[in-house]
């Protein structure tokens, strides 16, 4: 890695169907082994099933709402001070929030055995939209952990 210049952040291309950069990032996270067309098909079919399940007029807005509900605002990071390690709560930057939410949704969808990825993803998105399910539980656990360690917030760096 060069010490002189940091890499330029390339703009994300919007997805072809909805024209959303957020959805494009989500598709890229679902993609495995470079199979983008397969990832697109899975995500588009999952969003279609999800929007029918919740009877949404605009599937993209419903998807973004589900993602918004899954975004954490606080997390804990380990900080070593004088031989002791403290879990210090910190606020999460916006790009990391959405990245974590996407990873959690996809991870919990992959963990649902015996279903197609489309069905599992649609189910997880509808759970997030309704503020329930494993992804929301993960977010609440993260917030609870940060709340429990609020006493160490002054160790922020």
UniProtKB/Swiss-Prot annotation:
Keyword NAD attributed: no
PROSITE patterns named in the record: RIBOSOMAL_S7 (PS00052)
Cysteine disulfide partners in this protein: none
A Pfam family this chain is assigned to: Ribosomal_S7
Xref: InterPro entries: Ribosomal_uS7 (IPR000235), Ribosomal_uS7_bac/org-type (IPR005717), Ribosomal_uS7_CS (IPR020606), Ribosomal_uS7_dom (IPR023798), Ribosomal_uS7_dom_sf (IPR036823)
Alphabetical keyword list: Ribonucleoprotein, Ribosomal protein, RNA-binding, rRNA-binding, tRNA-binding
Record-level GO cellular component terms: small ribosomal subunit
Listed CDD domains: uS7_Bacteria
Gene Ontology molecular function, alphabetical: rRNA binding; structural constituent of ribosome; tRNA binding
One GO term (biological process): translation
Subunit structure: Part of the 30S ribosomal subunit. Contacts proteins S9 and S11.
Family: Belongs to the universal ribosomal protein uS7 family.
Purpose of the protein: One of the primary rRNA binding proteins, it binds directly to 16S rRNA where it nucleates assembly of the head domain of the 30S subunit. Is located at the subunit interface close to the decoding center, probably blocks exit of the E-site tRNA.
Protein name per the record: Small ribosomal subunit protein uS7
Protein's organism: Protochlamydia amoebophila (strain UWE25)
Gene: rpsG
């Amino acid at each position: 890695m060069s010490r002189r210049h940091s890499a330029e952040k390339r703009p994300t291309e919007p997805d072809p169907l909805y024209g959303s950069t957020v959805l494009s990032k989500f598709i890229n996270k679902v993609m495995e082994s470079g199979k983008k067309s397969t990832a697109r098909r899975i995500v588009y079919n999952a969003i279609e099933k999800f929007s029918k399940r919740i009877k949404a007029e605009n599937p993209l807005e419903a998807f973004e709402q589900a993602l918004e509900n899954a975004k954490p605002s606080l997390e804990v990071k380990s900080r070593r001070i004088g031989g002791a390690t403290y879990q210090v709560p910190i606020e999460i930057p916006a790009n990391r929030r959405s990245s974590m939410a996407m990873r959690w949704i996809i991870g919990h969808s992959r963990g649902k055995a015996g279903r197609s990825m489309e069905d599992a993803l649609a189910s997880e998105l509808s759970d997030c939209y309704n503020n329930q399910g494993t992804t929301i539980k993960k977010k609440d656990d993260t917030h609870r952990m940060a709340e429990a360690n609020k006493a160490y917030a002054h160790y922020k760096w």
